[in-house]
């Protein structure tokens, strides 16, 4: 009697390439032959090709942070306007657990960044830790700090494109804080800005010199596109004197929602420098919400919501480079949705079906207890999809598109 493990290699590859990524780890432990097969370049190429084909036709995968745990989700928006059963359009495929630790459920993830099938995860601990992870292969690399990691550090994962087409993966760490944050009596306040780069090739950190006339906010997540990371940034504004902060400002002297020059910035991992300021297709005020996303890892999308939630819309780039950007017409203005936080509002754009999937909390603003995905379309179309209970009011669901990768770390 023929066993499934005795199938010809080509047929076994065809069968196993259709298995969800979350089950590949279990398959590798099933038999030595399958463990070897799933690590072959031909199998990985077939698996990645199938993932990309599904993404173009109807379904794509996403990595989502739900309640500080990582999950693999499938998103299928094909024919969504005709089907009121929107709950079936977003499904949880499984929890990602291959962090090569004794008890992966004890690893609490506060931030996650995606690049080329790799994830950079930051743990939520008193002393944060960094780990680069390939969920497909199960490989991990825990990154030791040069000094120590801080709660408000900003990170990015990207790669340097070399002449031989080999990609050299790197981490950018940006510390922007006041040395005396714990002692409010200190005057003047000493601000520290420091940039470090970690190379996965050399397994080492180095400090780079960057002169900034702009601010990156910890809550505004960067998006990596073609190996480079883009952020929403604002012109640097000097802090007011301490006594000015604590005294009452005369009525009418303070503006309710001021406009500060805002733009995009790109960090080029090949030359290890920031590019020039890139224009936005709108002029935001301080209390407005801006979040970024990628479209099939080829275009940049930006979501803008006015502070009074009277208007929300998305633009998509038709050209994006470290020193140049041009924007296509507005994708569409959305219907009235709940106020978004800078720490939330991750989203996907489906250009073909003219739909957006926006991840946030439930409709209750004062006591949001449910993680929710909103499927938003033209002419005011909006449908919520419940993603389960939220264990913490300020723990938002965060998502990024995902295609398996054979990258070795």
UniProtKB/Swiss-Prot annotation:
Pfam hit, one: F-box
InterPro entries: F-box-assoc_dom_typ1 (IPR006527), F-box-assoc_interact_dom (IPR017451), F-box-like_dom_sf (IPR036047), F-box_dom (IPR001810), Gal_Oxase/kelch_b-propeller (IPR011043), SCF_F-box_component (IPR050796)
Coiled coil ranges: none
Domain F-box: 1-47
Gene3D superfamilies reported in the protein's UniProt record: 1.20.1280.50
Matches recorded under CDD domains: F-box_AtFBW1-like
Family matches, as PANTHER family: BNACNNG10540D PROTEIN, F-BOX PROTEIN CPR30-LIKE
Entry protein name: F-box protein At3g17320
Upper lineage: Eukaryota, Viridiplantae, Streptophyta, Embryophyta, Tracheophyta
């Amino acid at each position: 009697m023929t066993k499934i493990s005795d199938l010809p290699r080509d047929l076994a590859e065809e069968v196993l390439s259709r298995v969800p990524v979350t089950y590949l780890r279990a398959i590798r432990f099933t038999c030595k032959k399958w463990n070897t097969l799933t690590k072959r370049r031909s199998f990985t190429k077939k698996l990645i090709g199938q993932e990309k084909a599904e993404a173009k036709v109807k379904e794509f995968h996403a990595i989502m942070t739900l309640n500080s745990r990582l999950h693999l989700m499938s998103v299928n928006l094909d024919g969504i306007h005709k089907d009121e059963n929107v709950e079936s359009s977003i499904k949880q495929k499984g929890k990602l657990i291959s962090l090569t630790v004794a008890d992966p459920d004890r690893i609490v993830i506060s931030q996650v960044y995606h690049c080329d099938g790799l994830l950079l995860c930051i743990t939520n601990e008193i002393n944060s830790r960094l780990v680069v992870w390939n969920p497909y292969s199960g490989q991990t690399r825990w990154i030791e700090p040069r000094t120590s990691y801080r709660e408000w550090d900003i990170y990015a994962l990207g790669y340097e494109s070399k002449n031989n087409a080999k990609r050299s993966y790197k981490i950018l760490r940006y510390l922007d804080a006041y040395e005396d944050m714990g002692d409010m009596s200190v005057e003047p306040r000493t601000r520290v800005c420091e940039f470090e780069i970690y190379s996965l090739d050399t397994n080492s950190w180095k400090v780079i010199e960057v002169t900034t006339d702009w601010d990156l906010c910890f809550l505004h997540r960067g998006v990596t596109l073609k190996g480079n990371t883009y952020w929403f940034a604002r012109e640097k504004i000097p802090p007011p004197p301490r006594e000015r902060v604590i005294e009452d400002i005369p009525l009418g002297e303070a503006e309710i929602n001021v406009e500060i020059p805002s733009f995009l910035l790109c960090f080029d991992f090949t030359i290890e420098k920031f590019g020039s300021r890139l224009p936005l297709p709108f002029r935001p005020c301080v209390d407005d919400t801006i979040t970024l996303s990628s479209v099939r890892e080829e275009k940049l999308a930006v979501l803008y919501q006015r502070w009074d939630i009277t208007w929300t819309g998305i633009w998509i780039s038709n050209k994006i480079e470290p020193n140049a950007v041009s924007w296509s017409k507005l994708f569409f203005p959305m219907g009235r949705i709940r106020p978004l936080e800078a720490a939330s509002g991750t989203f996907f754009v489906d250009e073909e079906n003219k739909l957006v999937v926006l991840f946030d909390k439930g409709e209750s603003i004062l006591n949001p207890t449910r993680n929710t995905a909103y499927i938003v379309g033209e002419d005011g179309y909006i449908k919520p999809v419940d993603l389960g209970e939220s264990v913490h009011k300020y723990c938002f669901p965060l998502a990024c598109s995902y295609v398996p990768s054979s990258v070795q770390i």
